[in-house]
């Protein structure tokens, strides 16, 4: 939340009860609790993302699967759950971060956040899309996905890319982010002299300490 103006009250709730809250905390790294804003009269609530990027308003009527940090807020009858990966390999990201997801279902308005800009694909049945593990923001449940090792260890050592990529198959809509936070953080840390930019040297950079 960035600001509140007018006659707005705040409350705290735990969607899904204690079990649902613990799942969100352990599997997706989210808070046990969510803040509810209630309009008692005229007013406004301003929301912002946790890092530089873009915010999109999505009209939900059914179900979508989101990257764990994509969800910002919602209005209406929307349930938030932790979503398990469709394949065992989905629990591992090339950058060392778990590929954990959230499921949003119901009917209402949802606000999603992504680093950089959004890039959208409408996949037809059987159409494939291969993406970096950090670039996913949202997919429809009709899209199947799994993580696969790409091109062997040698390519990762010298190519500057991670070991794993997400293979998606339509039909369905996919939304990507052009600048994932993990990538931005590595670049900032490297520029500040406090770490290394692994995006430029892959695993080899880690081995050599670059």
What are these regions (language model features)?
Residues 1-210:
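Composition-driven recognition of glycine/serine/threonine/acidic- and proline-rich low-complexity segments
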């Amino acid at each position: 939340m960035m600001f509140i103006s007018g006659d707005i009250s705040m409350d705290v709730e735990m969607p899904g009860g204690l079990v649902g809250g613990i799942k969100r905390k352990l599997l997706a790294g989210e808070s046990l609790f969510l803040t509810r804003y209630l309009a008692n009269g005229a007013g406004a609530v301003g929301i912002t993302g946790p890092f530089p990027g873009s915010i999109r308003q999505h009209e939900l009527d059914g179900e979508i699967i989101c990257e764990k940090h994509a969800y910002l807020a919602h209005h209406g009858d929307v349930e938030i759950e932790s979503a398990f990966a469709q394949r065992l390999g989905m629990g591992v990201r090339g950058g060392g971060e778990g590929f954990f997801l959230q499921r949003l279902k119901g009917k209402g308005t949802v606000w999603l956040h992504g680093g950089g800009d959004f890039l959208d694909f409408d996949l037809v049945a059987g159409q494939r899309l291969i993406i970096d593990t950090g670039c996913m923001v949202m997919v429809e449940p009709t899209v199947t996905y799994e993580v696969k090792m790409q091109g062997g260890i040698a390519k990762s050592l010298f190519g500057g890319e991670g070991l794993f990529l997400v293979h998606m198959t339509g039909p369905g809509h996919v939304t990507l982010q052009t600048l994932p936070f993990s990538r931005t953080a590595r670049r900032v840390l490297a520029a500040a002299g406090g770490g290394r930019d692994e995006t430029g040297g892959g695993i080899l950079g880690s081995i050599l300490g670059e």
